[in-house]
A protein has these predicted regions:
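Zn-dependent metallo-beta-lactamase
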Residues: 4-73, 80-92, 123, 128
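Active-site-proximal beta-strand elements of phosphoester/diester hydrolases
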Residues: 38-46, 74-77, 168-175, 190-193
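Short Gly/Pro-enriched turn/cap motifs at secondary-structure boundaries
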Residues: 53-55, 152-153, 173-175
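Active-site HxH/HxHxD metal-binding segment of metal-dependent hydrolases
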Residues: 58, 81-168, 250-254, 258
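Active-site beta-strand termini and strand-to-loop segments that position acidic
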Residues: 65-69, 164, 184-187
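Short, glycine/acidic-enriched loop or turn micro-motifs at the edges of active sites
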Residues: 70, 80, 106, 138, ...
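Active-site neighborhood of phospho(di)ester-bond hydrolases with catalytic His/Asp-centered motifs
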Residues: 76, 97-105, 133-135, 174-176, ...
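Metallo-beta-lactamase
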Residues: 145, 168-173, 178-267
Length: 269
């Protein structure tokens, strides 16, 4: 039967006729059976898109968040293998109600980048035309990259809340990597896209990036996130899939830069 430690590390334990105990970790589900939150982390090139070398190289995290009682869910940053993502949702017996966009870069939403044509929201909408939630400052960029129309989008603002069943998802506008980058607060989890990684932050030298705005996001906008909240990033750059914000603050050198002047000297601006 399945057991969970601290609602995060889940495992199946079995005892054979000789009394031997075997334990198998359950990867990706980080909540207990008592908690209605459904939260699953997928890694491109590993959990989905296994045959795509670019998916493995880019190491994007995709998230499925929902309510285990109503079986409703949303996808965060659907890309690389839409059929694979939908197969996971079907296997989990969930119903897709929408997609959440952290930012408009093609490795997160589909499109062309670095000579790669990545499947994403355009293909998903052909199979399931549920609303796409994107920050109001990111909508134009998203439409250009994916070909979606205004009618496909639901524009979000900071501190707005989307309820999926009994699960509340709070949108947090965290610009810097792009003008409309956003994070999602779900209980004691923060899904951060490319705003913040375990060992770094999103680039500010790409179109729409702003070094000074990123510094404000990291030092002010995310400062209120409690140490015990677990950071779930947009890429597997840190060697681990997640970490408490308190640990990230201790080990991420980008969060230890004390002044805007020092920041601009390192990051440019």
């Amino acid at each position: 039967h399945q057991q969970c430690i601290n609602n995060r590390i889940c495992y199946n334990a079995q005892v054979d006729l000789a009394g031997n105990v075997s334990i198998k970790l359950v990867r990706g589900n980080f909540v207990s059976e008592e908690n209605p939150l459904f939260f699953k982390q997928l890694l491109s090139g590993v959990d989905i898109g296994q045959s795509d070398s670019s998916a493995k190289q880019m190491a994007n995290f995709i998230y499925i968040i929902g309510d285990k009682n109503t079986r409703e869910c949303v996808i965060v940053d659907p890309a690389w293998d839409i059929d694979g993502i939908l197969n996971v949702i079907e296997t989990e017996e969930m119903k897709l109600k929408g997609s959440l966009v952290t930012h408009y870069h093609p490795d997160h939403v589909g499109g062309s980048i670095f000579g790669m044509n990545i499947t994403g929201l355009a293909e998903l909408m052909e199979k399931n035309s549920a609303p796409v939630y994107v920050n109001k400052h990111e909508a134009e960029g998203l439409k250009q990259v994916t070909g979606l129309s205004d009618s496909d989008l639901r524009l979000t603002d900071s501190e707005e809340v989307l309820s999926i069943g009994s699960i509340d998802i709070t949108f947090l506008h965290t610009p810097g990597h792009t003008p409309g980058s956003q994070c999602f607060r779900v209980g004691d989890s923060l899904v951060a896209g490319d705003t913040l990684f375990l060992q770094g932050c999103g680039r500010v030298d790409l179109p729409g990036g702003d070094s000074e705005v990123m510094y404000d996001t990291l030092t002010r906008r995310l400062a209120k996130i409690q140490d015990e909240v677990v950071l779930y990033p947009g890429h597997n750059y840190g060697g681990k899939p997640s970490a408490p914000m308190g640990n990230v603050r201790e080990t991420n050198s980008y969060l230890q830069i004390k002044s805007l002047e020092d920041w601009l000297g390192i990051m440019g601006g």
